[in-house]
Amino acid sequence: MSTDLFPQAHSKHDLERGFALAPRFNADGLVVAVAQHADTGEILMLAWMNAEALKLTVETQIAHYFSRSRNELWKKGDTSGQLQDVVELRVDCDQDAVLLKVRPRGDGGACHVGFRSCFYRVLENGVLVEREAPLHDHA
């Protein structure tokens, strides 16, 4: 799927080795987005972006995403104060996923349930175990 905001790659070579940002949005008009802490390398969250979210992220250098559950654009941290300053944006080899290297503001968290990372649980012997304390209570 192509959009008016980004060019379409004209060849496999352009897609994989070209110099234009030409994201391959899925049938729902989305690409997967991984947010990684720019300083520690910790994976903070996985989300989705539509063309508008990607455009705003590129223009403002602040992470914007698309909420599939709310069906709306969302500027990460607008209500929580956990804005994500984008230090670097990468695409994968076929441009259907983006990696945002970010520096979180506020309390440094990214997870809506109060943790620094959305990946706060580890599977140990078939049971999920919380490996970190929440930054704040999510009530």
UniProtKB/Swiss-Prot annotation:
It is found in: Cytoplasm. Mg(2+) binds at residues 92, 94, 96. Keywords: Amino-acid biosynthesis, Cytoplasm, Histidine biosynthesis, Hydrolase, Magnesium, Metal-binding, Zinc. Zn(2+) binds at residues 93, 111, 118. The keyword Hydrolase applies. The keyword Hydrolase applies. Transmembrane segments: none annotated. It catalyses: 1-(5-phospho-beta-D-ribosyl)-5'-AMP + H2O = 1-(5-phospho-beta-D-ribosyl)-5-[(5-phospho-beta-D-ribosylamino)methylideneamino]imidazole-4-carboxamide. One of its GO terms (biological process) is L-histidine biosynthetic process. Pathway: Amino-acid biosynthesis; L-histidine biosynthesis; L-histidine from 5-phospho-alpha-D-ribose 1-diphosphate: step 3/9. Its EC number is 3.5.4.19. It holds the Pfam family PRA-CH. This is Phosphoribosyl-AMP cyclohydrolase. It comes from Caulobacter vibrioides (strain NA1000 / CB15N). The lineage of its organism: Bacteria, Pseudomonadati, Pseudomonadota, Alphaproteobacteria, Caulobacterales.
